[in-house]
From Swiss-Prot:
SMART domains: cNMP. The keyword Repeat applies. Residues 121-138 have a biased composition (Polar residues). Tetramer, composed of 2 regulatory (R) and 2 catalytic (C) subunits. In the presence of cAMP it dissociates into 2 active monomeric C subunits and an R dimer. It comes from Aspergillus fumigatus (strain ATCC MYA-4609 / CBS 101355 / FGSC A1100 / Af293). Signal peptide: none annotated. The modification Phosphoserine is found at S122. The gene is pkaR. It comes from the Eukaryota. Residues 58-67 have a biased composition (Low complexity). InterPro entries: cAMP-dep_PK_reg_su-like, cAMP_dep_PK_reg_su, cNMP-bd_CS, cNMP-bd_dom, cNMP-bd_dom_sf, RmlC-like_jellyroll. This is cAMP-dependent protein kinase regulatory subunit.
Amino acid sequence: MADSSSFPGTNPFLKVSTKDDKYSPIQKISEEEEYEVTSPTDPTFRSAHSGATAPTAGNSFNGDNGSNEGGEGIQFNRPFDAGFGQGSEGQGEHVEPPGGARPTAAANQGFPNNYALGRRTSVSAESLNPTSAGSDSWTPPCHPKTEEQLSRLKTAVSNNFLFSHLDDDQFRTVLDALVEKPIPAKDIKVISQGDAGDYFYIVENGHFDVYINPAGSVQPGPDGIGNKVSTIGPGGSFGELALMYNAPRAATIVSADPKSTLWALDRITFRRILMDSAFQRRRMYEAFLEEVPLLSSLKPYERAKIADALDAIKYPAGSTIIEEGAPGDAFYLLESGEAEAFKKDVEGPVKSYRRGDFFGELALLDDKPRAASVVAKTDVKVARLGRDGFKRLLGPVEDIMRRAEYSAKPSPS
């Protein structure tokens, strides 16, 4: 199997020269080798049934870029050469799928060639139940990286919201599973709207344009990818929706710079780590919120909503969590460690906090500046709830929080 035509590889996006290179600079990276699936109720069924039975352009496997063994072959197509009568996937040399010829039952039974007689799309290949995490023998992939690669990767993912809630072990697992994917040219199509998705991508450098066709998939012709709606730059990511919801790709992504770098995370690792960690995090916070006296009067579904809105933040000993006089933008629950409140012109701490205590509420209730500073006495972990979530979710306990204003002298918020 040629390394240049299979995932994973050192540079899977190598350009493949063909006779019609001069007509379109846009190439396509095909993530899937499975056949297209057409339902008998689809409007195109009748026309497909009455048409020729020869393989369509959209079903070609590799063109002339080599073997497709291993299930992750790469296909560079030119989708917009309408003058050559090509469909949305381009016309290349047709290569039969691995394992022998395609089934012939379709022709015998009157079904179109691309009806579901091949394998199902792999986007539905596994069912992941968060409650069964750890009950099977799944082992996350580990791709060795140099220190230089790790440094670049950490910088690329440091501000990505999808990784913000992971603990240190989960974060390391994700870093190990990511694979570097250099993009050597402009106008390379990384994913296509309507396709099944196998990877989630993080942008290390370069920019990628996002196109959406109202039809829901790439169409034939020079404008088949639709309208440009946005651009994704360094630190951004794309491809998560198709993996999270087992849905087709929602947009087409095309490289906008002559040289770019992506990091790719496969579907199973994405779902095992990111989605399961979100489920475990919710269960952990629901259990924690049950221990918070302030929230004991809430119903379970109300605590579940709060759990989904919380962000975990760690502070080392001696660091300031909130500062007196600053505008209030969040409410805090102390998850672990100890903290103390201080006021200007008052010697020593005015209040101490331990697991389950809360602070920062008064500035949000009354739209006033912070009345005190809260400093971490030890290494602490807090659950932060932003202003909007506070107003929306903590209405039922507002009276309790206001009573706390008078029961604690002076107030630490």
